[in-house]
């Protein structure tokens, strides 16, 4: 736990109210249950377009469960059920008739541990494109290159596209996973502690990449690292026991929290 607040620019810049900006996604009264365990309890959050929102909180607070709910990944867990609305493009996607394949194309996800396919670097990015019906080899190659460039990986792998993705370093593998996600041209990227398993240099590259990607995508990131949240996010939501304690601009939340629980957590006096 930190013993001091994350460093924030001493000149406090007031961040626009997230509800005043165009929303990429939102949840209304969202509940998630694992059997009898009530993991997420009536969460209302709005995610502004082309901004980075960080979800922070102690281990087991529900932030990763909430993130997985946003593109219905929790549906893959036996005994999990969800209630409430998950709004994307103004449509509630928390309905049985919704095509989850399309949901996950529009709302991409990158997990904590890099999980490249046991295929070539090229095939890792091209696989989803082919699955979605893209057949023209030139178009596929163009999309692969574009995606690898956006993930700041192209210059490192352009001469080795046929090599196994498993030959890459951990940081490169994670950027490959980001390239794989952006190749599907999503509008939203969900990042579940994407740098927690990486060394400091690779972490720095991922953070730089996040700052670049928000020009094209709305990014929602779970992180246990409050310094990282302060560096990369525009908005931050503090979760505790499955509820949102506080949600505001990142600079405001870290320099002038409105709730005592938030103050205690970011000051290292929690628990």
UniProtKB/Swiss-Prot annotation:
Question: According to the UniProt entry, what is the EC number of this protein?
Answer: 7.3.2.1
Indicate whether Acyltransferase appears among the record's keywords: no
Residues forming the ABC transporter domain are 25-266
Protein location: Cell membrane
Q: Which organism is it from?
A: Listeria monocytogenes serovar 1/2a (strain ATCC BAA-679 / EGD-e)
Q: Which GO terms describe its cellular component?
A: plasma membrane
Q: What is this protein called?
A: Phosphate import ATP-binding protein PstB 2
Q: Which reaction does it catalyse?
A: phosphate(out) + ATP + H2O = ADP + 2 phosphate(in) + H(+)
Q: Which domain of life is it from?
A: Bacteria
């Amino acid at each position: 736990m930190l013993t001091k607040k994350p460093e924030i620019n001493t000149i406090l810049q007031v961040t626009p109210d997230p509800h005043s900006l165009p929303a990429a996604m939102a949840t209304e009264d969202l509940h998630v249950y694992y059997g009898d365990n009530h993991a997420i309890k009536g969460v209302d959050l709005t995610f502004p377009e082309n901004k980075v929102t960080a979800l922070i909180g102690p281990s087991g607070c529900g932030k990763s469960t909430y993130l997985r709910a946003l593109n219905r990944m929790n549906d893959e867990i036996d005994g999990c059920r969800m209630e409430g609305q998950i709004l994307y493009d103004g449509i509630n996607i928390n309905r049985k008739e919704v095509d989850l394949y399309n949901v996950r194309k529009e709302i991409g996800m990158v997990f904590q541990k890099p999980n490249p396919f046991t295929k070539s670097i090229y095939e890792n990015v091209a696989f989803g494109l082919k699955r979605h019906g893209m057949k023209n080899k030139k178009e596929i190659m163009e999309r692969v290159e574009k995606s690898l460039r956006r993930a700041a990986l192209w210059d490192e792998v352009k001469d080795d596209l046929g090599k196994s993705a498993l030959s890459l370093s951990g940081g490169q593998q994670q950027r490959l996973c980001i390239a794989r996600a952006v190749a599907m041209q999503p509008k939203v990227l969900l990042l579940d502690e994407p740098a927690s398993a990486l060394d400091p240099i690779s972490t720095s590259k991922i953070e730089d990449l996040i700052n670049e990607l928000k020009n094209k995508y709305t990014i929602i990131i779970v992180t246990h690292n409050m310094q990282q949240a302060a560096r990369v996010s525009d908005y931050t939501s503090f979760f505790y026991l499955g509820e949102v304690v506080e949600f505001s601009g990142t600079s405001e939340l870290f320099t002038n929290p409105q709730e005592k629980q938030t103050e205690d957590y970011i000051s290292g006096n929690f628990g």
